[in-house]
Amino acid sequence: MIKVMVTGALGRMGSSIIKTLCENKEDYKVVGAIDVPNHPKKGIDIGELIGIGNIGAPLETADNLEKVIKETRPDVLVDFTAPAPCVNTVKIASENNVNLVVGTTGFTNEQMEEMEEIINKNNIGAVISQNYAIGVNIFFKTLELLAQKIGDYDIEIVEMHHKFKKDAPSGTALRALEIIQNNLNRDSKAIYGREGLVGERTKEEICIHALRGGDVVGDHTVIFAGDGERLELTHKASSRQAFVSGVVLAVKYIADKKDGKIYNTFDVLNLNE
């Protein structure tokens, strides 16, 4: 049985992950649930707070993270919070020999480098991904092929999320951009939206458009526009369960790895071949 701690436990993703783990009691046990410092619900069982009944894991706060880790000894910590607190969580978990599944997005390059150094130094295993949905990763894999075969077409990326999402563009859109640029046989330049008299579109442009509204879980479309035809590759998530299922697979994948390496969902889903 894999013992799991979740930070961001009362968030949309955190609570969904806990519910799914608890539905698979033979394989997983939620031993810790962490949320923001001074949370008024501290001490109340996380199961009671998310509507599934007592599971024996009282809500704790981030300022007590190391104490709770030492008491519960999780195998894997799952983090869906925000960049700055996540980096601190990675440090504490790594120093206490706890493997990681990170779904937080919006990191700076410096924050990513810091986490990589911490994970390598402490010789733990980690999965870090902008999107854990299985379909999205097939979407990413298909983008590799399209960029290689029709990369001379004009390329645009459009993403839409719910009105509460704090970062833009989404981590998934940025990952799509990275995959495209890594597989193009030409120069490219990312731009973010267009406004005013911008002139004709240049061949190098890959423009990302971020839309926000309503309760959209996550829509991503990459457009390859050529002369006389247009190919659009789209993934739409209708439920967070799409992401949660991938997170659970990542927990199982990383649980016993102690090698100082960072893996991604291509590794988890065996898509790297």
Curated annotation (Swiss-Prot):
GO cellular component: cytoplasm
Binding site for (S)-2,3,4,5-tetrahydrodipicolinate: 162, 171-172
EC number assigned by the record: 1.17.1.8
Major location category of this protein: cytoplasm
Active-site residues per Swiss-Prot or TrEMBL entry: 161 (proton donor/acceptor), 165 (proton donor)
One Pfam family hit: DapB_C
InterPro entries: DapB_C (IPR022663), DapB_N (IPR000846), DapB_N_CS (IPR022664), DHDPR_bac (IPR023940), NAD(P)-bd_dom_sf (IPR036291)
Compartments where located: Cytoplasm
Record keyword Nucleotide-binding present: no
Residues the record lists as binding NAD(+): 8-13, 35, 103-105, 129-132
Pathway linked to the protein: Amino-acid biosynthesis; L-lysine biosynthesis via DAP pathway; (S)-tetrahydrodipicolinate from L-aspartate: step 4/4
PROSITE patterns attached to this UniProt entry: DAPB
Example of a GO MF term: NAD binding
Biological process terms in GO annotation: diaminopimelate biosynthetic process; lysine biosynthetic process via diaminopimelate
Statement: the UniProt record of this protein carries the keyword NAD: yes
Keywords: Amino-acid biosynthesis, Cytoplasm, Diaminopimelate biosynthesis, Lysine biosynthesis, NAD, NADP, Oxidoreductase
Function (record text): Catalyzes the conversion of 4-hydroxy-tetrahydrodipicolinate (HTPA) to tetrahydrodipicolinate.
Entries under NCBIfam families matching the protein: dapB
HAMAP family: DapB
Family, similarity comment: Belongs to the DapB family.
Protein name: 4-hydroxy-tetrahydrodipicolinate reductase
